[in-house]
């Protein structure tokens, strides 16, 4: 069972953005049209979430940060998808990901910066810190999936929480980072409105999910009546070929 503090506290209307499986998230409906800056840490080869978001919000700016997505990795991914599609005759649409990348990120609204997100600036490693990214930004929707590096930037997220309307974040290896998570949840003023297991990561030695996807919403967007003792999260299976994970929480 997961610790009690990890479960959702408020019930709000949610909309699914992005892929049906991995790469998609449930987010508060009311936040989408109010967002001025969509900032995403971690992109990979799936930007369906970002594309969906910009469909519903015609005016917000998008900046993504991912140092692993380069021209070389995109071309390599293209040939891998081509081989897979020809051999197994499945998912032919993935062949066009390379073209889709250039069409989407070379427009006037969407920018992909090849930087690694960290706590400090390190030019040699192309690492950029959150102060440089979030400073002077308002009405922020923040999405984070950076494979355990999220724990290095939690203090900076707290620093800019007043300007964040919504945070969607993947917490990896939660069993090893419960103290950090508990500290973050106590200091972070945004409230958890949805928690989902990521079944791609599997279970730990206590049969708890290793990774959770959490959606936080700013307090200004809900009422006291929205607080509920037990909330059933909206979730979709990340990996349809792996066993579904059901979340259960301790009472205290």
What are these regions (language model features)?
Residues 1-21:
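Rossmann-like AdoMet
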Residues 7, 102, 107, 154-157:
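Homeobox/homeodomain signature
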Residues 14-123, 137:
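SAM cofactor-binding core of SAM-dependent methyltransferases
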